[in-house]
From Swiss-Prot:
Keyword Endoplasmic reticulum: yes
Annotated family: Belongs to the serpin family.
Residue ranges annotated as motif Prevents secretion from ER: 414-417
Protein name: Serpin H1
Alphabetical keyword list: Acetylation, Chaperone, Endoplasmic reticulum, Glycoprotein, Phosphoprotein, Signal, Stress response
Any one GO biological process: collagen fibril organization
N6-acetyllysine: residues bearing it: 206, 318
Record-annotated site: Reactive bond homolog: 376-377
Induction remarks: By heat shock and retinoic acid.
Length: 417
């Protein structure tokens, strides 16, 4: 079946090349502003946090798809540090491994990193991002905190009255929808703890490929959630030259796909066969990823990926607590008095909600590539079963996103032996 698919993809690539007009001049590679030493240090720390938090969430049996922006999580910790005192503040810095940095270094460094990496224009990606801190109607946010949190973290602030829970939830979800231009219509259906502060991050991210997928190389396929459960999905296909590595010992393959302007890349790691991702996740560390990437080589690869939007909401409260953020979430111990001027607030929930769109769009591709000999026998990267993916900034090495796709949207197709 896969050999037939490979042949079909190669024939389609050649046939479609004749149809494509000479491409427009591709956008010149973007120019990222040089990061300060503080921002570079915090980029490294946020990457370490990414793997720790991902591993903690991967062990949660209730979690299927994972979608995290380590940069945004780091900014949330910075916000807690900004609004906290004593152990409450120091724990937030410790989870970020930034204990030895002065408070001002943390806030200015994270603010710089957030502005640089979320600059959609420079990076030619679609990334709509909003952060809002909701406080109980009985609490007023301090002016200094409102000003500083807006300056460093672009965080908005609102009071919310949960006596009318339906109206409160509607308000949160409407804000998220407006922030993401309707791509994320719902953050949550319920809020369990309504007597504390709610930090809500709402995001929509859409990669624009350095070389787009042809819109006609799209069809309906099956995605094997497990060996016995398959859902129908739309798949998009293209053949091109990519950094690629096949680890035969660990039975996994990985591919790196540059995004437009080449300031960042999407990296996908996938087991050779359908299996739970637990084995691969145990291998995944910052050091191991670096080692794998060092072995990648430019090769012809026929890539097939699910097409569509993945929507995921995580309440990170308990997962951050597992990494050491215990005081801020404890009603009896939290000291967030820099937020409100009083010790009358704790962090009840940290909602991290993302819509991530896998689509064909990107820079025009050069049809002349399909006459090259090396594309006649490409490696096959057929993502029809669970995989891990990362969006990586090529300058700082910071991760814009880390996630896994276990169950895409789709109806059950059939049972397989």
């Amino acid at each position: 079946m896969r050999s037939l698919l490979l042949g079909t993809l190669c024939l389609l690539a050649v046939a479609l090349a004749a149809e494509v007009k000479k491409p427009l001049e591709a956008a010149a590679p973007g120019t990222a502003e040089k990061l300060s030493s503080k921002a570079t240090t915090l980029a490294e720390r946020s990457t370490g946090l990414a793997f720790s938090l991902y591993q903690a969430m991967a062990k949660d049996q209730a979690v299927e798809n994972i979608l995290l922006s380590p940069l945004v999580v780091a900014s949330s910790l910075g916000l807690v540090s900004l609004g906290g005192k004593a152990t409450t503040a120091s724990q937030a810095k410790a989870v970020l491994s930034a204990e030895k940095l002065r408070d001002e270094e943390v806030h200015t460094g994270l603010g710089e990193l957030l502005r640089s990496l979320s600059n959609s224009t420079a990076r030619n990606v679609t990334w709509k991002l909003g952060s809002r801190l909701y406080g109980p109607s009985s609490v007023s946010f301090a002016d200094d905190f409102v000003r500083s949190s807006k300056q460093h973290y672009n965080c908005e602030h609102s009071k919310i009255n949960f006596r009318d829970k339906r109206s409160a939830l509607q308000s949160i979800n409407e804000w998220a929808s407006q922030t993401t231009d309707g791509k994320l219509p719902e953050v949550t259906k319920d809020v369990e703890r309504t007597d504390g502060a709610l930090l809500v991050n709402a995001m929509f991210f859409k990669p624009h490929w350095d070389e787009k997928f042809h819109h006609k190389m799209v069809d309906n396929r099956g995605f094997m959630v497990t060996r016995s459960y398959t859902v129908g999905v739309t798949m998009m296909h293209r053949t091109g030259l990519y950094n690629y590595y096949d680890d035969e010992k660990e039975k996994l393959q990985m591919v790196e796909m540059p995004l437009a302007h080449k300031l960042s890349s999407l990296i996908i790691l996938m087991p050779h066969h359908v299996e739970p991702l637990e084995r691969l996740e145990k291998l995944l560390t910052k050091e191991q990823l670096k080692a794998w990437m060092g072995k990648m080589q430019k090769k012809a690869v026929a890539i097939s990926l699910p097409k569509g939007v993945v929507e995921v909401t995580h309440d990170l409260q308990k997962h951050l607590a597992g990494l050491g953020l215990t005081e801020a979430i404890d009603k009896n111990k939290a000291d967030l008095s820099r937020m409100s001027g009083k010790k009358d607030l704790y962090l009840a929930s940290v909602f991290h909600a993302t819509a991530f769109e896998w689509d064909t769009e990107g820079n025009p591709f050069d049809q002349d590539i399909y006459g090259r000999e090396e594309l006649r026998s490409p490696k096959l990267f057929y993502a029809d079963h669970p995989f891990i993916f990362l969006v990586r900034d090529n300058q700082s090495g910071s991760l814009l996103f880390i996630g896994r796709l276990v169950r895409p949207k789709g109806d059950k197709m059939r049972d397989e032996l």
